[in-house]
């Protein structure tokens, strides 16, 4: 239990901007971080949901409301996953060989492809949030999407081999076993039940669409890079949440 709590503290300090007391990082805590990843999603989702509610009461235009609501998940996570999205887009869209793509993936400079990709992402996500406000969609979707995406990404992260260049990814997955996978599956099943209760069968449809989207992202990155990494996880998470948001606009 102590190591699980340490893993949660490490996850909060790593994946959010929430100030946390100092915790010494070690392998015992690191191997529990992925189990805690859906909890991080719950925190991000609650902040997104509450932000939606509060901003929706402001006497400002729907355009400004949409922009403010859209950036909440990026702000609370310190742009961490957005950085991974940009790095992966830069590498894949370069259309180079595998070795060069891996070099681009680790390169800290920002390329044109990543900038164009994030602009497209922002346009679509802004439009989806605008639709949420305009058509009064169920805001609980904003609470559940970050949980679902992180749960699925965490499962893939501890299941699929990490690329050798991803030292941090190996650090998180070292010492994980079948028990961690079972816990993540049970967590996803619980979320699935709750999501279904709130949204009915449409909730299950959205969950399946997000699962397929993340799975396709991971499969594409395995083909391109030979494995998974922190950047790949961030890329898959961002795309999964965007697809989930877009699906919610279409089907709810």
Swiss-Prot record:
Record-linked Pfam families: CobS (PF02654)
Transmembrane spans:
4-24, 38-58, 60-80, 113-133, 141-161, 190-210, 232-252
Q: Where in the cell is it found?
A: Cell membrane
Query: What membrane topology does the UniProt entry give?
Result: Multi-pass membrane protein
Top-rank lineage group of the source organism: Bacteria
Organism placement in taxonomy: Bacteria, Bacillati, Bacillota, Clostridia, Eubacteriales
Family label: Belongs to the CobS family.
Q: What is this protein called?
A: Adenosylcobinamide-GDP ribazoletransferase
**What does UniProt give as GO cellular component?**
plasma membrane
Return the EC number: 2.7.8.26
Kindly report, in one word, the top-level EC class recorded for this enzyme.
Answer: transferase
Q: Which UniProt keywords apply?
A: Cell membrane, Cobalamin biosynthesis, Magnesium, Membrane, Transferase, Transmembrane, Transmembrane helix
UniProt organism field? Clostridium botulinum (strain Eklund 17B / Type B)
Coiled-coil intervals:
none
Pathway in which the depicted protein is active = Cofactor biosynthesis; adenosylcobalamin biosynthesis; adenosylcobalamin from cob(II)yrinate a,c-diamide: step 7/7
PANTHER family from the UniProt entry: ADENOSYLCOBINAMIDE-GDP RIBAZOLETRANSFERASE
Q: Which cofactor does it need?
A: Mg(2+)
Reaction equations catalysed: alpha-ribazole + adenosylcob(III)inamide-GDP = adenosylcob(III)alamin + GMP + H(+); alpha-ribazole 5'-phosphate + adenosylcob(III)inamide-GDP = adenosylcob(III)alamin 5'-phosphate + GMP + H(+)
**Which purpose does this protein serve, as stated in its record?**
Joins adenosylcobinamide-GDP and alpha-ribazole to generate adenosylcobalamin (Ado-cobalamin). Also synthesizes adenosylcobalamin 5'-phosphate from adenosylcobinamide-GDP and alpha-ribazole 5'-phosphate.
One of its GO biological process terms is: cobalamin biosynthetic process
As one GO molecular function, the record gives: cobalamin 5'-phosphate synthase activity
């Amino acid at each position: 239990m102590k190591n699980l709590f340490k893993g949660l503290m490490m996850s909060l300090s790593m994946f959010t901007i929430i100030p946390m007391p100092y915790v010494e990082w070690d392998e015992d805590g690191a191997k529990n971080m992925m189990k805690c990843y859906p909890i991080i999603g719950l925190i991000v989702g609650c902040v997104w949901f509450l932000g939606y509610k509060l901003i929706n009461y402001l006497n400002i235009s729907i355009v400004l409301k949409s922009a403010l609501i859209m950036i909440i998940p990026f702000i609370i996570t310190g742009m961490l996953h957005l950085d991974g999205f940009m790095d992966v887009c830069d590498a894949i869209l370069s259309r180079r060989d595998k070795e060069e793509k891996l070099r681009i993936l680790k390169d800290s400079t920002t390329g044109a492809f990543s900038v164009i990709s994030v602009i497209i992402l922002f346009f679509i996500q802004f439009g989806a949030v605008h639709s949420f406000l305009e058509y009064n969609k169920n805001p609980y979707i904003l609470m559940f999407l970050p949980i679902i995406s992180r749960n699925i990404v965490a499962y893939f992260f501890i299941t699929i081999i990490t690329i050798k260049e991803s030292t941090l990814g190996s650090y998180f997955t070292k010492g994980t076993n079948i028990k961690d996978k079972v816990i993540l599956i049970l967590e996803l099943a619980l979320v699935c039940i709750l999501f279904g209760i709130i949204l009915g069968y449409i909730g299950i449809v959205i969950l399946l669409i997000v699962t397929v989207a993340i799975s396709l992202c991971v499969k594409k990155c395995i083909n391109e890079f030979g494995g998974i990494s922190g950047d790949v996880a961030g890329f898959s998470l961002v795309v999964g949440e965007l697809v989930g948001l877009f699906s919610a606009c279409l089907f709810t």
